[in-house]
Amino acid sequence: MRLAAENLSGERGGETVFSGVSFALGQSETLLVTGPNGAGKSTLLRIIAGLLPVAKGHVAFSGGGEIFPDAGAACHYLGHLNGMKPALSIEENLVFWRDFLGEERLSPLEALEIVGLGEIAHLPFGYLSTGQRRRTAIARLLVSYRPVWLLDEPTAGLDRASEAQFAEVMRAHLSAGGIIVAATHLPLGLEGTQELKMGAGN
């Protein structure tokens, strides 16, 4: 599998926020997208996910077969918002996402055990702390398979132990041949990563 961008430009509110971005990632590779606020990191991830239009250039994904014919189909997107319904239990939220996304990988309870929330799977999402909410969103990555993970400040709200736990989750995804593109201000505990510095001439 291969994810690539060539001479990519992105806009926000009709204004160009970045231009000339190119990268290529193969299986088990990670790209860390860094730079100051407003440099276009989140916009880049949303364009790759197919949530925003490409202003110029193109994004290409290959090797996903009929199940994942393009980048949008191949991606899990974890944004600033966790994408959960407060009134539903943690497990019910993950059941919804598993059924909506398809390509089941782990059961909701298995995913919650991995992020350390198995014992409170019955609690409404709205009862959780900020860190627990983020860990639930991370568990969403595990209930349905996607080869590409797009992560926007994924460790926001996590304590040190949860950061280390998430690093193990990411390593497992990479070991299985997955690809990660992460916008972050903080180190993610991964080795051998590529870096794209936004706002540095783009």
Swiss-Prot record:
GO CC term (a single one): plasma membrane
Q: Where is the ABC transporter domain?
A: 3-200
UniProt-recorded name of the protein: Cytochrome c biogenesis ATP-binding export protein CcmA
> Per the record's keyword annotation, is Nucleotide-binding included, yes or no?
yes
Catalytic activities: heme b(in) + ATP + H2O = heme b(out) + ADP + phosphate + H(+)
Q: Which organism is it from?
A: Chelativorans sp. (strain BNC1)
One GO molecular-function entry = ATP hydrolysis activity
Q: Where does ATP bind?
A: G35, P36, N37, G38, A39, G40, K41, S42
Q: How does it assemble?
A: The complex is composed of two ATP-binding proteins (CcmA) and two transmembrane proteins (CcmB).
Pfam families hit by this protein: ABC_tran
Task: Just give the chief location class.
Answer: membrane
Per the record, membrane topology reads: Peripheral membrane protein
Q: Which UniProt keywords apply?
A: ATP-binding, Cell inner membrane, Cell membrane, Cytochrome c-type biogenesis, Membrane, Nucleotide-binding, Translocase, Transport
Per the UniProt entry, the Enzyme Commission number(s) are: 7.6.2.5
Database matches in InterPro entries: AAA+_ATPase, ABC_transporter-like_ATP-bd, ABC_transptr_haem_export_CcmA, P-loop_NTPase
Q: What GO biological process terms are annotated to this protein in UniProt?
A: cytochrome complex assembly
Name the family. Answer: Belongs to the ABC transporter superfamily. CcmA exporter (TC 3.A.1.107) family.
Top EC group: translocase
* Record function comment: Part of the ABC transporter complex CcmAB involved in the biogenesis of c-type cytochromes; once thought to export heme, this seems not to be the case, but its exact role is uncertain. Responsible for energy coupling to the transport system.
- Asked if Cell membrane is a keyword of the record, the answer is yes
Q: Where in the cell is it found?
A: Cell inner membrane
